[in-house]
Amino acid sequence: WDIFRTLRDNGYITTGTSEQYFDPEALRFLPDRYVEGTCPHCGSDEARGDQCDNCGRQLDPTDLINPRSRITGSAPVMQPTTHYFLRLSAFQDRLLEWLESRQGWRKHVQNMAIGFTQEGLLDRAITRDLEWGIPLPPEANDLGEGKRIYVWFEAVIGYLSASKEWAQIQGTPEAWRDWWEDPDAETYYFVGKDNIVFHAVIWPCQLMGYEGLNLPTDVPANQFVTFKGDKASASRGVGRPIGWYTERLQPDAIRFAIASALPEQNDTDLSDEEIIRRVNDELVATWGNLVNRVLSMTARHFEGAVPPTQALADSDADLLASVDATLSETAELIAKVDLRAGLRRAMEGAQAVNFYLNAEEPWKSVKADRDRAGTVLATALGAIAGLAVAFAPYLPFSSSQVAAMLGLTRIEEWRRPILAPGTPLGPVVPLFVKLDDDVLDDQDGG
């Protein structure tokens, strides 16, 4: 209740009367999400009273065309009711200035937040006539019985309350301040585009009204993942839950397929065929096969240890330098929250190692020039060690496997590990399973 009380004490929460939809058959006021109708912006007839999933616009129940009760299907009627309101209008100028000053935000996020703010922020009720939800504390309740804090106001506060709870559990109750009050701390809110307004407009207003807490560093909202052209939605049964995939695919295979197709700027249709293609033709063929063939060749010809190296040729030094560049550039892309490009850059690094091997052909030179073959394989192992670091944020499970096969305890730093000659390698196991065409044919999944 700290934020509620502080906002009220600072004059940003006031009491007001509004009209709210009432279901005459159910004899109850309807929460925003219990009112459905046609979106006035895009025409979708499945819009809810708080937002339209189809176009992502935030709505009030009164905005809907031909509203209906989700409980009974009847046409609701308006009745007056008293609520607490958050004075969003008080933050209009300050918020707009802050939004326009953001550097590096995704354009669709910044444009939506600025556009919504420029339309004029309206004071918004933060309570509802409900039987469920967070009740108002008696000392803060001037409204009477039957009022609850509504979800849009309290949900985003969960970020702060979870931080405080974490600090308590750690036995350092003030540690949350390191993240919320230190001006050098950064916060990133990963959401879908239907949550942009809540995280880039409403939550910053709450933080501004509270005073002294860090505003979001970035709100890297994604566009929608679609299935057969329709937006994935658990509530509407479109798409498949992640558990369905984990029963059929390796976790890193799922992560790769999603990360390589992240809808960072546009909606992305993620079909079964596309998932299988990305896993087989990119993850398995490029990265998985590279790791397997280099470690298998080393185990076979150099007693399962990192080979000794002679003086590095230009091609060897160039490869290791390119891997170091891959690490640096991948880190920069991740820092910019350009995650799909970061993964693509890591894959380009793996392709460079494959090109190097095809040019050096250690499987041939091992018979005629064992020293040179050993140097090539040691160089390739070093490159793989560096790439495992670049892949780790995307493919944590298989990256740990690669580290173990290279004789490393774990990946600890964002740099290319140095593999000393003679370092014993772990057992060589395939990282990924090639997918059959029918692996995702289960009809129970969506």
Question: What do these predicted ranges mean?
Answer:
Residues 31, 144-148, 194-195, 245-246, ...:
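Secondary-structure capping and boundary motifs in well-ordered enzyme cores
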Residues 42, 65-300, 344-346:
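Structured secondary-structure scaffolds
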Residues 139, 176-186, 305, 332-335, ...:
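Helix-loop segments that flank and shape redox-cofactor active sites
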Residues 16-21, 25-26, 37-56, 67-70, ...:
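Basic, alpha-helical terminal appendages of large translation-related enzymes
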Residues 183-187, 225-232, 281, 311-325, ...:
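Short, mixed-charge aromatic SLiMs
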Residues 4, 204, 291, 295, ...:
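Short, amphipathic alpha-helical segments that act as regulatory/interfacial helices
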Residues 267-272, 324-332:
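Short, charged/polar, low-complexity loop and linker segments
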Residues 1-121, 165-175, 291-330, 350, ...:
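Conserved, charged catalytic cores of large soluble enzymes
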